[in-house]
């Protein structure tokens, strides 16, 4: 998990330095990575089920998790990570990423492409297929290849190295 957090922090920092806000980030439920603050998340979602503070690449970060009754409809768990390096410096109160763990059947490949269009890239992580959107959305599918396992929203980013682009 720590490696994923570092990788995400690195990608977000690289995207902000290279692309300094040229594309809008994908948002979900009023939460937009790179724009929304802790105070706004709390006003939208209320008090989280649990929180955790951690250090990522020397920065103090925080994670808020909304589960069960506190999670949005159709979602098992909503995880919001705070702490983002921006062109003007580190912002500990800014949303770095937003991760949705949907309930089975809530999303599938068809609903993803209907809602977000064709992905900028597709790939495989072990046995798991994923879609990448340059606006900052990563969609990982269940091992059956159809249902959605997780959706992670980040600020806009370049495709991961080696990600094939759709034809």
Tell what function each PLM region has.
Residues 36-167:
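A cross-family detector of function-defining hotspots
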Residues 23-35:
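Cleaved targeting-peptide boundary
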